[in-house]
């Protein structure tokens, strides 16, 4: 792969890395940011899952991967989300971008504003779907940051990334299988997204939850960019995840929500101050 990164998503610690700040084309990994903004709009109740959105001529004519919707349809937001995530549908992605942003151009502005707010210094978006375009780029580090934010901020929507097959009613029975092969070979994997263009190569952001000794449900995240084939990106991602769970040991220093020290305070409002990690 041109670049890769393995991160302990629970702690935000990088475990393995290669060229993680080199600019790369994200291909359909762009849809991770599109999904983030769609989920944010859902959480803010700007849209709802059962709300229907129109399919514009622009969305209908999108090249590349599609869920095969057309302008005669009014498609529920939830089905567009499934089409974007499972089928990597560029038409579904455009319909969502237009529905949330009012236009694709305004939605791209929102994408770049969110990237800046997240500190994604090596990322710039030119479109919501990830087709090759000058100036459209990211880095492995930024993709890891974005993915961990997606997992942390919207856990209620993670289940969409585990769907293995999906086809919208009335559309052709093709391109309906999730392109993340790790979902079919590793039961601990629950996401996230594949990407491919001739310029970007084969890319995959994968995440899994497994138990470390005395620390259940530890989440690791792998980013593999610019692999030579579908098989290579899957195998490299699987190797990274397996290595992370076997080469590292998580050590719990103390429980969250419990004080580990209570130093005295001189002339303070309280006689002592409890110190420790606030979160349980």
Predicted segments with their positions:
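Active-site-adjacent loops and short helices of periplasmic peptidoglycan-processing enzymes
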Residues: 1-155
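Domain-terminus/edge residues, biased toward the C-terminal soluble/receptor-binding domains
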Residues: 121, 132-280
């Amino acid at each position: 792969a041109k670049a890769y990164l393995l991160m302990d998503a629970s702690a935000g610690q990088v475990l393995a890395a290669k060229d993680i700040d080199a600019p790369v084309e994200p291909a359909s990994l762009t849809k991770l940011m599109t999904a983030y903004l769609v989920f944010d709009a859902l959480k803010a109740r700007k849209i709802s899952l059962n709300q229907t959105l129109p399919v514009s001529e622009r969305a209908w004519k999108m090249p590349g991967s599609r869920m095969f919707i057309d302008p005669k349809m009014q498609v529920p937001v939830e089905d567009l989300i499934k089409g974007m995530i499972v089928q990597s549908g560029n038409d579904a992605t455009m319909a969502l971008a237009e529905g949330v942003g009012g236009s694709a151009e305004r939605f791209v502005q929102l994408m770049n504003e969110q990237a800046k707010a997240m500190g994604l210094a090596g990322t710039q978006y030119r479109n919501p779907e990830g087709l090759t375009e000058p100036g459209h780029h990211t880095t492995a580090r930024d993709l890891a940051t974005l993915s961990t934010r997606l997992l942390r901020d919207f856990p209620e929507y993670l289940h969409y990334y585990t769907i293995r097959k999906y086809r919208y009613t009335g559309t052709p029975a093709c391109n309906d299988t999730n392109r993340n092969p790790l979902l079919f070979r590793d039961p601990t994997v629950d996401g996230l997204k594949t990407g491919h263009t001739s310029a970007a190569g084969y890319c995959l952001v994968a995440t899994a939850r497994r138990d470390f000794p005395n620390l259940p449900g530890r989440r690791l995240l792998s980013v593999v960019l610019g692999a030579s084939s579908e098989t290579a990106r899957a195998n490299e991602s699987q190797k990274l995840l397996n290595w992370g769970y076997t080469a590292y040991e998580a050590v719990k220093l103390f429980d969250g929500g419990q004080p580990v020290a209570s130093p005295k305070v001189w002339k303070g409002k309280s006689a002592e101050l409890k110190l420790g990690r606030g979160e349980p």
